[in-house]
């Protein structure tokens, strides 16, 4: 009995092992494309599909109210996506959320520069009122404001 696999089977096995590691959770912002990012919305269905995605549902129901300029929009049958918007509400990019954990989504939103308030009704610092999302190098330059 031979343990050697044909090349096609080896390729399929390798692809199956690598695919989970390269899922949508590896999103990296392209700051050139996201120039002018000021707000975002999470588009998702409100029912059965969201109920299957416990991590995404927890983010939508519990975390979104804490973020400034991040809202939720119910769309029947929609897969959960983070829609990044510019100053005039023009769509800059869509990021699928289905494969991400609650922790990964929160990390992404914070990496994009959205301000997380201490409480849903808390005041927002002046530097985050009009343009909550900035590249990391810009936020570090203005940390003293």
From Swiss-Prot:
Keywords: Cytoplasm, Endoplasmic reticulum, Golgi apparatus, Selenocysteine, Signal. It is found in: Cytoplasm, Perinuclear region; Endoplasmic reticulum; Golgi apparatus. Residues 1-23 form the signal peptide. GO terms for biological process: adipose tissue development; corticosterone secretion; hormone metabolic process; multicellular organism growth; response to selenium ion. One of its GO terms (molecular function) is oxidoreductase activity. InterPro entries: Sep15/SelM_sf, Sep15_SelM, Sep15_SelM_dom, Thioredoxin-like_sf. Widely expressed. There is a cross-link at residues 45-48 (Cysteinyl-selenocysteine (Cys-Sec)). SUPFAM superfamilies: Thioredoxin-like (SSF52833). Pfam families: Sep15_SelM. GO terms for cellular component: endoplasmic reticulum lumen; Golgi apparatus; perinuclear region of cytoplasm. The active site is at residues 45, 48. Its main location: cytoplasm. It comes from the Eukaryota. The keyword Cytoplasm applies. Belongs to the selenoprotein M/F family. May function as a thiol-disulfide oxidoreductase that participates in disulfide bond formation. This is Selenoprotein M. It comes from Homo sapiens.
């Amino acid at each position: 009995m031979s343990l050697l696999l044909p090349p096609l089977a080896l390729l399929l096995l390798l692809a199956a092992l690598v695919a989970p590691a390269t899922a949508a959770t590896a999103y990296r912002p392209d700051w050139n494309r996201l120039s002018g990012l000021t707000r975002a919305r999470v588009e998702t269905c409100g029912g059965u599909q969201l109920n299957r995605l416990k991590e995404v549902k927890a983010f939508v129901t519990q975390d979104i109210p804490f973020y400034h300029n991040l809202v939720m929009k119910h769309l029947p049958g929609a897969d959960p996506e983070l829609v990044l918007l510019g100053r005039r509400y023009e769509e800059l990019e869509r990021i699928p959320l289905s494969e991400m954990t609650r922790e990964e989504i929160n990390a992404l939103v914070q990496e994009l520069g959205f301000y997380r308030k201490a409480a849903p009704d808390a005041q927002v610092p002046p530097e985050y009122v009009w343009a909550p999302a900035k590249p990391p190098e810009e936020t570090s330059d203005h940390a003293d404001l």
